[in-house]
UniProtKB/Swiss-Prot annotation:
It is an enzyme of class 2 (transferase). Belongs to the glycosyltransferase group 1 family. The chain crosses the membrane at residues 5-25. Residues 1-4 are lumenal. Keywords: Endoplasmic reticulum, Glycosyltransferase, Membrane, Transferase, Transmembrane, Transmembrane helix. Pfam families: ALG11_N, Glycos_transf_1. It catalyses: an alpha-D-Man-(1->3)-[alpha-D-Man-(1->6)]-beta-D-Man-(1->4)-beta-D-GlcNAc-(1->4)-alpha-D-GlcNAc-diphospho-di-trans,poly-cis-dolichol + 2 GDP-alpha-D-mannose = an alpha-D-Man-(1->2)-alpha-D-Man-(1->2)-alpha-D-Man-(1->3)-[alpha-D-Man-(1->6)]-beta-D-Man-(1->4)-beta-D-GlcNAc-(1->4)-alpha-D-GlcNAc-diphospho-di-trans,poly-cis-dolichol + 2 GDP + 2 H(+). InterPro entries: ALG11, ALG11_N, Glyco_trans_1. GO terms for biological process: dolichol-linked oligosaccharide biosynthetic process. Pathway: Protein modification; protein glycosylation. This is GDP-Man:Man(3)GlcNAc(2)-PP-Dol alpha-1,2-mannosyltransferase. GDP-Man:Man(3)GlcNAc(2)-PP-Dol alpha-1,2-mannosyltransferase that operates in the biosynthetic pathway of dolichol-linked oligosaccharides, the glycan precursors employed in protein asparagine (N)-glycosylation. The assembly of dolichol-linked oligosaccharides begins on the cytosolic side of the endoplasmic reticulum membrane and finishes in its lumen. The sequential addition of sugars to dolichol pyrophosphate produces dolichol-linked oligosaccharides containing fourteen sugars, including two GlcNAcs, nine mannoses and three glucoses.
Amino acid sequence: MSTMLWVVVAAVLLFVLPVVRVPMLDLTRRNIIRWQRGGIQKYTTRYYGFFHPYCNAGGGGEKVLWKAVQETLLYDPNCSIVIYTGDVDSSPKEIIANVIKRFDYEMDFNRVQFVFLKYRKWVDGSTWKHLTLVGQAMGSMLLTIEALLRFVPDIWLDTMGYPFGYPVVRWLAGLPVMTYTHYPVISSDMIHKIEIENQKQPSKKGTLKLIYWKLFMKWYQYVGKFVDVAITNSTWTGNHIRSIWKRVKIKVMYPPCSTEKLVKNSSPTAYETRQNQAVLIAQFRPEKRHKLVIQAYSDFISRTASKDHFKLVLIGSTRSEEDRAYVETLKSWAFDTLKIPKESLTFKTDCSYDDIKKFLAESTFGINAMWNEHFGIAVVEYAAAGLISLVHASAGPLLDIIVPWDSAKKQQLPYSDSTKDTRTGLFFKDKSDPDYKPTDAQFNNYGSLADIFEEANSLSIAERKQISERAKECASNKFSDNTFNHAWDHALDELEHKTSRLGSN
C-alpha cells in the first residue's frame, strides 16, 4: 500500500474514531487471546502497556523504559507488563539479555511480555519523504491501532514520545494515558526560527512551511487533552511542553542514572591513577555530533603538538546497518582525512555496562556535544563517576546537570553564583549551532569545543579533583535510581486516581 494511501486512511480514522466507537475492542479487552510468540500468560487483571517501538535501542530513553518497568513490577506485585515494540528481528530472550548487559537491571522478567509490531516503519522518518512530521504523526496513530488490535492493556504508558496516538487509545479502548516525554515533537522555538527566516527572505514556500508547522502545532496542542499524567525528563523539555499542553499538569522527573553505582565505584583517593583520557558516550547517530568532536579534537591536537594531550574514546551503541556504516565513515574521516593518530583515538561499539563502567572509572573527562540535548543521561554518568564534563551550553546539561554546586551546603546554586569554585564542568558553543548568532552575548561567553579541550587539558590535579567532587555530589543528590523510583511511584499513585475516575465514568 502506498504512503499516500496510508495518510488517507489515517486521516479518515482521525475524524471517524471520535464519532464512531468500536465496541469490538472493549469486548476484545475482556476476552482477548493473550499471545506473544507462544502466548501472553495471564497473571492478573492489571496489564501495564508500555508503548516503546525501539525498546532494544540501548540508549537513554530505553534506560528510562526498563527502570520504569522494573519499578512498576515492584509497585504492583500482581501486575504484568506488556512492551509494544517493533524490534521484530530480536527475540524476547535477546532483548532481555541486552537489558541486563547494557543497563545492569534485574527484574521478574517472567511478568514481562512483548507484543511485536510489524509496521514500525510508519513512525520512521525515512518512510515519509514529504510532510514528514504529519506522516510520522499519522504513522504513530496507525501503529497505535496495530498495538491495540494485537493486545489491549489496562493502562497505556508512552515512554518514547508518540503523542498523536493518545486520542486513538482513548477513543478505541478508553484507557488512561501516562506519558514520559523526552523532547517536544515541535516547539515554539522551531516555529519562531521559520518566522525569522521568512521575514528575511519572504517566499511562497516559506509561507506555506510556516502555515504547515503552525497547523501541526495546533494538532499537537489538541492531543494533550488525552493525557492523564504527563512527565518530562528535564527543565528544558518541561518548559516547552507546558507552553504546548497548557491545561495539563507537567511534572519534571529526571531519568534514572544509576549514580549510586557510579559514585560507589569512584574513589577520591584513586583520582591520580586515572588516565589522561576523555570519553564520549552516545549512540552513533549524526545528531550526537561526533564529527564536531573529532574535528575539535584534531584542532586541539594540532595546538598541543609539543605537549601531552588526552586520548579520546568514542563509545556508543549501533541500532542498525546505517549506524554501523556511520561509524565506518567517522573512522575514515578521522584517520584518513584528518590524520589523527590511531593511538590517540579509539572507537568502541555496543559495549556492555561493565565495560562502560570501566571506561568511566579510568577516564578523566566526559564529552557531550549535542545541541539542545533534552536531558543527557551520559553527562550525569560522567559526573557521578567523577569525570569532568565538557559539554554544550544548552538544555539539560546547562539547566539541570552541570550546575553550580555548593559543597558545604550540598545544594545547587543559581547561575549568578557560578564561579571557578562552584563549577562542575566546562561549557562550549559552536558556530554550527542552529541558533548561532555572532552578535549574541551568550556565544561570546563560551569558547569553542577545541578551546575547552585545551583548558581541560591544562587543569592541575587539584583543580580536577575539586571539580570532580562537586560534580559527584550534585549527581548523587539529584539523579539517583532511588530518586527516580520514588518519583515514579508517586506518578503511578496519581495514575491510580485517574484510573478510578475513568472507570467510574
